[in-house]
């Protein structure tokens, strides 16, 4: 029996589909690290589009001459109960870079010893490492020594490359980068990274996240006045076309078949987004022709399974964020004046929450000056919950 995974599978190569073009683009540009050409990347796309799968596949298949570190900021955000500080992020960078060094058999014997020797040479206030676990490093110690530690962490990847002939480059992926907007001064943090990339020739950063194309954080990092000033290699991961969706289902599903109208409705529901395709296919009947009515009924009956990622996101939102989303559900796209007239708080507060939703990839801003929900699946899920339960989810 075939099963289409709704989480990233262990055997990522088995389920990798239709991202060969993007894979080759990234792989080719990263190979330039060996030549001292450090490209920096910004990868965006809808939730569930396959950004993380693409990057996991990319890192898995890179040659051993490249060290890689994968930093998922949602892990830090979750551990800190929705709060994020520069100190915690720097600590995460340090811990995961250390893990990358330790996992490389070519350098493990000497690298950790050098790492701690160098850290102790920083002469931090009231702290000595003594080969203790970096995870145990107290945040107040980092705060008191932030300038020293941030400089050390930012310089470390290039120093590793310079210290070992076998290592030709260091690649650092920062997933859910939009969470950096929660820092006290996110712009300063982006500029911190930028300032070191200008002096490093074998280190590449890959920022990725589910953010709107018009999100403020995109401009903050790669806009004309942003830290990287438009110099990042920017790649948006697109949805599957109808033909690609058909081929994907034929290859990986448990013999799911459609008539023409059934497939049209299925594609309209999923919009070619792999996460929705997988979860929907897993609940459809196999070895029979799925008609438009079968698709409609299955969608309504299983909306919580199909829109699972939005259930998770909804639980993390504030009341004001939910209030704004429901306003878009009930009214469609809205301009600034309409929004101001329909909320009970100040325009400054409204602007703050619109920025939050945009940076989370939930709303976008159109060329005609209106805000709207970026993913219609969220609207469908909320509407169906209201119809079946008489109220929106809390």
Predicted regions and their residues:
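Short amphipathic alpha-helical interaction segments
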Residues: 343-360, 365
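Alpha-helical DNA-recognition elements
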Residues: 61, 192, 283, 356-360
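P-loop NTPase nucleotide-binding core
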Residues: 38-170, 180, 186
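Walker A/P-loop-proximal flanking segment of P-loop NTPase domains
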Residues: 1-62
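Winged-helix-like regulatory helical subdomains adjacent to P-loop NTPase cores
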Residues: 278-347
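The catalytic "switch" region of P-loop NTPases
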Residues: 7-11, 167-173, 177-269, 283-287, ...
């Amino acid at each position: 029996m075939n099963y289409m995974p709704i989480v990233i599978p262990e055997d990522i190569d088995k389920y990798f589909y239709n991202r060969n073009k993007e894979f080759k683009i990234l792989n080719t540009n990263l190979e330039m690290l060996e030549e001292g050409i450090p490209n920096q990347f910004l990868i965006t796309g809808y939730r569930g589009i396959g950004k993380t799968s693409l990057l996991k596949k990319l890192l898995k298949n890179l040659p051993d001459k490249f060290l890689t570190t994968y930093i998922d900021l949602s892990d830090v955000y979750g551990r800190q109960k929705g709060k994020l500080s520069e100190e915690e992020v720097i600590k995460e960078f340090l811990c995961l870079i250390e893990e990358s060094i330790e996992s490389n058999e070519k350098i493990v014997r000497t690298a950790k010893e050098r790492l701690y020797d160098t850290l102790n040479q920083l002469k931090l206030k009231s702290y000595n490492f003594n080969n203790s676990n970096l995870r145990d490093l107290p945040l107040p110690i980092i705060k008191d020594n932030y300038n020293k530690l941030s400089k050390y962490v930012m310089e470390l990847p290039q120093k590793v490359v310079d210290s070992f002939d076998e290592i030709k480059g260091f690649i650092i992926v920062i997933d859910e980068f939009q969470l950096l907007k929660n820092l006290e001064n996110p712009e300063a943090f982006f500029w911190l990274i930028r300032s070191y990339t200008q002096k490093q020739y074998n280190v590449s950063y890959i920022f990725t996240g589910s953010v709107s194309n018009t999100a403020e954080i995109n401009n903050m990092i790669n806009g004309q006045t942003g830290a990287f000033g438009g110099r990042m290699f920017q790649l948006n991961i697109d949805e599957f076309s109808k033909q690609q969706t058909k081929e994907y289902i034929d290859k990986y599903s448990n013999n799911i078949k459609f008539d023409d109208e059934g497939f049209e409705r299925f594609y309209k529901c999923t919009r070619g987004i792999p996460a929705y395709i997988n979860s929907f296919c897993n609940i459809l009947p196999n070895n029979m022709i799925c008609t438009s009515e079968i698709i409609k009924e299955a969608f309504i009956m299983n909306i919580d399974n199909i829109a699972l990622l939005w259930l998770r996101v909804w639980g993390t939102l504030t009341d004001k964020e939910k209030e704004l989303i429901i306003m878009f559900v009930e009214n469609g796209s809205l301009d600034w004046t309409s929004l101001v007239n329909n909320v009970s708080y100040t325009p400054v507060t409204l602007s703050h929450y619109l920025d939050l939703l945009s940076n989370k990839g939930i709303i976008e801003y159109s060329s005609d000056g209106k805000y709207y929900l970026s993913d219609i699946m969220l609207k469908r899920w909320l509407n169906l919950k209201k119809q079946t339960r008489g109220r929106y989810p809390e």
